[in-house]
Amino acid sequence: MKEKVVLAYSGGLDTTAIIPWLKENFDYEVVCVCVDCGQAEELDGLEERALACGASKLYIENVIDEFCDEYVVPCVQAGAVYENKYLLGTSMARPLIAKKLVEVARKEGATAICHGATGKGNDQIRFELGIKALAPDIKIIAAWRNDKWTMDSRESEIEYCKAHGIHLPFSADSSYSRDRNIWHISHEGLELEDPANEPNFQHLLVLGVTPEKAPEEGEYVTMTFEKGVPTSLNGEKMKVSDIIGRLNELGGKHGIGIIDIVENRVVGMKSRGVYETPGGTILMEAHQQLEELILDRDTYAMKKEMGGRFASLVYEGKWFTPLRLAEQAFIEETQKYVTGEVKFKLYKGNIIKAGTTSPYSLYNESIASFTTGDLYDHHDAEGFINLFGLSCKVRAMKMAEQNVEMF
């Protein structure tokens, strides 16, 4: 009986060519797995393609709700944004894909897992760290890093497929390299490879339009959160995945969430990409607006710092680590009272605050108002400032004694 290998399969040219390559070079029975995180139409005809290329079977694992509830929500609660821009759409999906690959490998009794991530990117790290953490005994085959992999272009991959009786309508023409799930879609390649070039948004965008082409009239949206988790949109209770889907429609319509970023990859190089994250951008902004009202100053500052660390951890593929569990435990503690309603207006790429309420709001109008109130005496500030500024005053006095001008 042949040994089995589980292949992370997308249906694209790379992973399609890997099926006969695995059979030819390793004599494996190939079991394909496609993990559906919300790729939409990209799944059409996938099973027929995998079987036609020599796979013994294809698993399509629908994990959209698990992805949103167990991976997206923690990142939203953390305010996890990599290098101030990237909302981690690809990064946070990879550990879940790795988890499902391992589950199928165990079910099938497979001895190896194969992926088609390139040797220059981050995904090879994310997949392999996940597999190593969950199944250290399973062999990992990275096709693009394997000495037996000789294909180096779309043309050579197409020719290899044809030589093995696989005739599919793949084009040798270059196109954008894209990754899509319910949270985002990324675009790399073509004119984007030169940072001096402006993106061809008319040809590139999938989920929405540029702000210039958005409607002239804004649209109001109301979102409710309970303990940092979105629970309803415009008064309608929804599960998280449905909220994200609806926000994608609204955000795309109004030109929200398009970023052009040069990011620092884990492997050391810089890469340029355009990301569309309309729903995610709205959700992150709404959550932050609510936190501004509820968290005290020290907790807000520490959580912001932790959010940056959490983003780096997710970006680097370290989801299945004790550190992620510890950081997430801290973040969840901060979310106990992040409950309330956020109203905002979407208008030509902007998310404009239109009102925030919470039963746990720390904003007290009688204290914050410029008018006289009972809870705060303006004279109290004098003693506070004298103490708060004492070190400044002492330093200045000492420098004056020594005839030193510091500023």
Write out the residue ranges for each language-model feature:
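Nucleotide-activated chemistry modules centered on ATP-dependent adenylation/adenylyltransferase
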Residues: 2-407
